[in-house]
């Protein structure tokens, strides 16, 4: 019979990751991490390729598609997150159609450069980094500047959908931590 003290719940080394212990950074130096009030972690879908033989269907793995993520940013009077995001759109190549001589267009290269390197960092209770997602070639696919209402005193939330080519995960990038034996 196993010793009760060796069970995972009896160990002081076991601590679940907490959903609220994270930071988001896209490298612009202007948007502080605390404005990112919610973010989806990366996820993928592995496609399948069926092969038919007589009365049977055999499935083989196909292509991986990394699914878009959504982010929620709390807009701020002092930082103006909506203004930062519109500026990113302009940096991506968008130009307001104010004259017939506007020829600029948005490019993937411009979108990626405007977005910066998007990282989602997971932390412990004492702010040690325990995991980090880096979204490769990320760019903002959709922007919703929020809602205003006289019936509410809630903070204004900006919703973003971010698309990317793939994500890389680095487990415990700050060094080793104790593990259960």
What is the predicted function of each stretch?
Residues 1-181:
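Glycine-rich, low-complexity intrinsically disordered segments
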